[in-house]
Design a protein with these regions (language model features):
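Conserved catalytic core of nucleotide-sugar-dependent glycosyltransferases
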Residues: 113-200
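Short, well-formed alpha-helical segments that are part of the catalytic scaffolds
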Residues: 27-43
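Short beta-strand-to-loop acidic/aromatic patch adjacent to the donor-nucleotide binding site
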Residues: 100-111
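Acidic ATP/Mg2+-coordinating residue in the GHKL
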Residues: 52-54
Length: 258
C-alpha cells in the first residue's frame, strides 16, 4: 500500500467520521526551525495559525513564505514584558480557529510523520480525551538531512502493521507522581467540543501545558502509540534551555531566514 501525498480529508475521526484538523503553533524567536517544520507539516492540517510577538518579524516572514496566517500579539511577553506567556498566546491562536473538529497544539520545532493522518485514522479517537505522542530527538542540521534521506522517514509505517523508529533517541514522557501520564505541550490533540483554555500566566514555556492536561481526568489522557514525531534541535542542550526565550544556536548555521 502506498501512503503518499495524503490529503487532510483522508484522515479518520472519532467513530470513523471524517476528521477536520486545526492547529496552533506559538513561535517566538524560533523562525529558523518554523521554516523547516511548516514545510513538512502544512499538508496535515485543514487550518493552521501561528502566533508570535509584534517584534518577531522573522517569524512573520516565514509565515508569509508558507502562506500561513500569522497572529501577532503583545500577550506573548506578558504584561511587564519580562516573561514568556505561552498559554496566553495559545489561547489567542485558538480564538482564530473554528473548533468544529480536532485541535492540535504543536511546538515550532516538531515535525509530524508524513503518514500522520493515516495513523490518526487507525485510532478510535474519542472527543472526551486528550491525546499525546512521542518524539524522537534529531540533533543538528546534518542529522536532519541524513534522516530525510532514509526510507524510515519517508514512511514510518511499513508492511501495514509496523511503526518504525528511526533510531534517534526517544524523548521523555511525563508520568506525574500523583496524576499519571500527561500529554505535554509539544503535541496535544483534543476535540473542539471540550472548550478547554490554556492557563493564562505561568511565566515561561513549561508548566502551563501540564496544568492544561490536568483538565482531563487520568483515564482520558492517552498516548497515541502509532505517532512518532521528530523533535528538531540545533544542538544537544539541557532540558529547558529555551523555556524563557531562545538560548540555543540557530538550526543550520548556513540557513538564512529572510
Amino acid at each position: 500500500m502506498d501512503y503518499t501525498a495524503l490529503r487532510p480529508s483522508s484522515g479518520g475521526g472519532s467513530h470513523g467520521a471524517p476528521l477536520f484538523l486545526e492547529g496552533v503553533i506559538v513561535c517566538w524567536q524560533f523562525a529558523d526551525l518554523l521554516d523547516v517544520t511548516l514545510g513538512e507539516n502544512l499538508g496535515h492540517f485543514d487550518d493552521l495559525v501561528v502566533v508570535t510577538s509584534h517584534e518577531d518579524r522573522q517569524t512573520a516572514a516565514v509565515c508569509r513564505r508558507h502562506s500561513v496566517p500569522c497572529v501577532p500579539t503583545d500577550a506573548i511577553r506578558g504584561r511587564w514584558r519580562d516573561a514568556f506567556n505561552k498559554g496566553a498566546a495559545i489561547n489567542i491562536g485558538l480564538g482564530h480557529l473554528s473548533h468544529r473538529g480536532w485541535l492540535l497544539h504543536l511546538d515550532a520545532d516538531i515535525v509530524l510523520p508524513d503518514c500522520f493522518r493515516t495513523m490518526l485514522a487507525k485510532e478510535w479517537l474519542e472527543p472526551e480525551c486528550l491525546y499525546g505522542a512521542d518524539r524522537l530527538n534529531v540533533v543538528g542540521w546534518d542529522q536532519w538531512q541524513k534522516l530525510k534521506a532514509t526510507a524510515v522517514y519517508r514512511r514510518q509505517f511499513q508492511y501495514r502493521c509496523l511503526v518504525q523508529n528511526s533510531g534517534h533517541p526517544l524523548g521523555a514522557r511525563l508520568i506525574h507522581g500523583e496524576y499519571g501520564y500527561c500529554p505535554i505541550g509539544f503535541f496535544q490533540l483534543w476535540h473542539g467540543s471540550a472548550r478547554r483554555r490554556y492557563p493564562h500566566n505561568c511565566g515561561a514555556a513549561e508548566h502551563s501545558d501540564v496544568v492544561f492536561a490536568l483538565q482531563w481526568p487520568g483515564p482520558k489522557r492517552r498516548l497515541l502509540p502509532q505517532v512518532l514525531t521528530y523533535h528538531l534541535q540545533s544542538e544537544a542542550a539541557p532540558m529547558g534551555v529555551d523555556w524563557r526565550g531562545r538560548k540555543s544556536m540557530p538550526f543550520g548555521s548556513s540557513r538564512k531566514t529572510r
